[in-house]
Each structure stands twice: as C-alpha cells, then as structure tokens.
Amino acid sequence: MLCTAALAATCGLAACGSSQTSSSGASTSKRTDFVLGGLFPETGSLSYVAPAQMAAFKLAAQDINAAGGVLGKSIATTIADVSDADHADQNTAGLQSVLSKNPSVIVGNPSSGVVKNTYHEAEGSKVVMISNGATAASLSGISDYFYRTVPPDTVQGAVLADTIAQDGVQKLAIACFNDEAGNGIRDVVVKHLQSAGVDIVYGEKESFDPTEKNFSSLASSIKASNPDAVLVIAFDQTVPLIKSLSSVGVNTKHLYFFDGNMSDYSKTLDAGMLEGDKGTVPGAIATAEFRKRLKTIDSSLTTYTFSAETYDAVILAALAAQKGGSTDSGTVKDNLASVSGTDGGTKCTSYRACVTALKNGKDITYSGLAGIGPFNTKHDPSSASIGVFTYDASNLPQFDHSQTGKVS
C-alpha cells in the first residue's frame, strides 16, 4: 500500500452486479456543485502516509478548477481524519463529517480495515467511495458504491510470493498483524508459496495484535522456527518488531516486506540492517515531475504513498460527473467505469484533455498516473503494476523491476 520517498526517488504501481455502462442521464434532478470529500489517516498507525495523499487530493482539485471545474463550476473540497482500523469511533466520526457536506464522491481511505468499517454508511447515504489504497481481496465487488484505484491483494500477493520463492527460500516465517490488510495478503502469499513447495515454519495462521508494543515473545518464536527468511506484514509496528528480531539473533538481511511497510528506514534502523531485503508495492511510482508538483502543495513531503492513485481517483470522479451531466453521487457511480475506459474511446492523460474530448461527444479512456486498467465488474482495476524493490546499505528501498498483473 505504500510508495515512499526513496521508492519515488528511484523510479517515480464476489460480484456486486453493478452496471459497467455509462449513464448520461442518471440523475432526474441535475446537480451542478461538485463537492469532493476526502478521508485520510491523519492520526494512527498510517498517519505517515496521509500527507502525500492529501497533497495529491488537493493538486487534483487544483488541476480540475484550472481546467474549468466540473460542468463549468469550480469544485469544493472537504477532508476529515479517519485514523486507522483500531479507532472505529474516529472512522465513523470522520466519515460523518464528510457526509454532512453532501459530497459528490469520497476519496479514501487507504486502509482495508477502515473501508470495512465505513463503506456501509457511505452506501446507505448513496455516496460513492473510491479507495486509494485498500487492497484486501474481500473488498472486490463489496458494494455498488465502492471502487478502488489499486489492485486487490491477489495481484501483489502473487508477485511477493514469486519473489520469495525465486530467491530460493525454503523455510519462511511470517510476522503478521491481525488486520484486514495483513491477514488478506498473508493468506495469498501462503497459498502461492505452499504451491511452490516453500515450508511456512511460523505464521501461517498466527497473527499479533496491532496495538502490541512488546515483540520479544514473537521474535523468540520466530527465531525458534529456524527460518531462512521472515516476511514482515505490519504498519508502524515494523521498526520495533525488526529490532526485536535482531535482538534474538534473526538475520535482518533476510527479510521481506509488503506495501504497508515498504518505507524509508534510513533514520530509524542502523545502517545496513536491511541491506538486500526485498518488498513489493502495488501501483505506480510517483514520477519526478509529479513529486515536484506535489511539493508545491506540501514542501515537507518525504514519502509518496499512493499519491498517484489518490490523484487519479479524484480525476476519475470529476470526469464521471462531467460525462453524466450532474454532480450527484449516483451520476458519478454510473459513469466511473465508462470514463476509466470500459467502453473504449479516446485515450486522454489529463483532466483538461479528457473534458475536451467529452465536450466533443467522444467516449474516453482516462490513462492516468497510476497506470491502471479500466474498472472491471467488481470495481477493481482490470490490470495494475506491482513494483519489486531491494533495500540498499542505507536502508532505503531501490526500484528493481515491475510486473504487470491482471485482476481476475
């Protein structure tokens, strides 16, 4: 779920039965004020990823207004903090704050657990929610009103498992937190690795409490399982967990990570501690030009977690309203798939270019920064890239290669 500053510096990835056809007349009473809602984890275990996502959200709104807005009117924005899945009260409070502004769409949250805690209320209010980072496979097709600009864990999990197996690991231990995101990708990785003949010596079913602060017992259990390598699936628990593993003699140069903790550890861990370790990140890598533009919004940015996916979610929603001729959320819902390219049409790479094509009566395929394929019938991207990264001697992740996967 993450794309850090270091990653960016090196290279820039149950059907609900909803219709995939566009609907230019979805609303019986046309609305013309587009209100863009945002839900981001400004507090909690994912707070370090919020700044870049909020910057991308604001940059997309700025670009939309610079191109004439939606239906000729500038859009308004509203943002609320939803924290993480361990703070359900804040999940609800944040959502209700945004819903009170009568949004045309809500972009966020990047946490699968938070989405699980909030999508029902958004659906009940008939407001579209587009997640910029929730990857749990269980979210595919969960609601007519839920979309996402990242692929489900089935894609990243397969690439991560292939990376581990191709490195020759025979015995793998897994340290996984008990969270929707953690358990989801863990299960995908385990399935693929067992098919490849890799023995899961610890963590096939075990998981730790996300609020845990002391990892000495877990580290000792992993050490006792005598693994060749350890897959660490956690958020802000990662640093203390790695330190605990090191303290009991686990080789921290044989670790693997997923998007939730592929981060810059140059200031939090001793130099060389992660050298050679690998991990995967779904979605696109923020390009140098995009990073430069984001810094005009927030000059303090050092990590670019799902910033491209956030930007594209905003643009897609605005284009859906523009195509449908109304800014109510029902119209946005009914036109999202079409502007993503399910109907084919003129390829366009910016809001301005896409709006011009729509005004000329053309169908469009928005080809944005995230590089995803058109939405499928489960409201997932039909294809997406997964980046594979290797840590250098400074504990910075460096891009190695990417693999494009199709979403079933």
Regions found by a protein language model. Give the residues of each.
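Extracytosolic ligand-binding ectodomains
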Residues: 1-408
